[in-house]
Curated annotation (Swiss-Prot):
Compartments, record wording: Cytoplasm
UniProt cross-references to SUPFAM superfamilies, sorted A to Z: EPT/RTPC-like (SSF55205), RNA 3'-terminal phosphate cyclase, RPTC, insert domain (SSF52913)
Catalytic activity, EC: 6.5.1.4
Catalytic activity field: a 3'-end 3'-phospho-ribonucleotide-RNA + ATP = a 3'-end 2',3'-cyclophospho-ribonucleotide-RNA + AMP + diphosphate
One Gene Ontology term, aspect cellular component: cytoplasm
Protein name: RNA 3'-terminal phosphate cyclase
Source domain of life: Archaea
Keyword Membrane in annotation: no
Residues of the active site: 325
Family the UniProt entry places it in: Belongs to the RNA 3'-terminal cyclase family. Type 1 subfamily.
UniProt KW ATP-binding keyword: yes
UniProt: ATP binding residues: 100, 300-304
Amino acid sequence: MIEIDGSYGEGGGQVVRTAVALSAVTGKDVKVTNIRKNRPNPGLKQQHLKALETAARICEARVSGLFPGSSELFFSPVEIKGGKYEVDIGTAGSITLLLQSLMPALPFAKEKVKLTIKGGTDVAWSPTIDYLQHVTLRALEQLGYAGIVTLKKRGYYPRGGGEVSAVFEPCKLRSFHFRRVKENRRTGEARREEETRNEGRNQNQRIEIQGISHASNLPAHVPARQAEAAESLLLEAGYGSRTKIQSFELLSTGSGITLWSGYCGGSALGKKGLPAEKVGRRAAEEIILELSSKAPVDVHLADQLIPYMALAGNSSYTVRELTLHAATNIWVTEQFLDVKFRIEEKEGLFEVSVD
């Protein structure tokens, strides 16, 4: 049995998500203690419980410690099976974080897994659904990952009501290397995309950033102003952009914007009292920071790629900063798999690799 101290490093829900996913893949029992110990509301929350319940259903696991506020979890998987599953997180629990708990395990399922999930699609402290679709899954395609996530309806805090459908096929993960083009080691589509992006940094107007600006129960000018502010700042930095505008009438009032280019993204959520222009600029500033660093992946994707790297083997990427989230994910992954990550600083960036 693997024992994981849930307070290690970043000490948040990601420790549990990665531990459970890798437990399912390896078939090793896991006990996680001190879950979210240093958080204002420690222990498991509703969205964690739903993720764990779903993981247990998919891999026929025995589980103990599944209750709100639980600081300890035992998870004993049997086999990752396929099938159809419906999950209602309740309120605005993050759909993307629930998927993060499952996705590393699903290539190893016996057959196709189909999910219908209700909850929050654009909520604080989690990737937006647009980021998952256009950055995370796009990068995972380079590993041979076979997954499609479809947005049916957005859900905002506090009532949620969003809906996403997802289909994941069993597949064999292949090694990947997301590096600067000057290292000249990449091949295929991913290399061509990186060449385009890196050449464009000398002439930023050649990089086109795409985005979606959206709002619910607000005047149509709100998502338009978010987009205009983002595009204006991007233009000042020399980047071309195209942003779709979406307006809805849903359960909760909310807004947000997600921008992406290659394997880098930027996003921001609106809130009461925060001008739409500030929301747009925050997303633009985030992606400009990533693109200007010349790193092929952004700091959030770098965190998410860790378990896939270990499962694929012989993989690497370069990122502008190694976050505590990523370092914690590395530690958890090394507890389950016979791998050792290496981190090297090169020309102001960090190369993370695993054999």
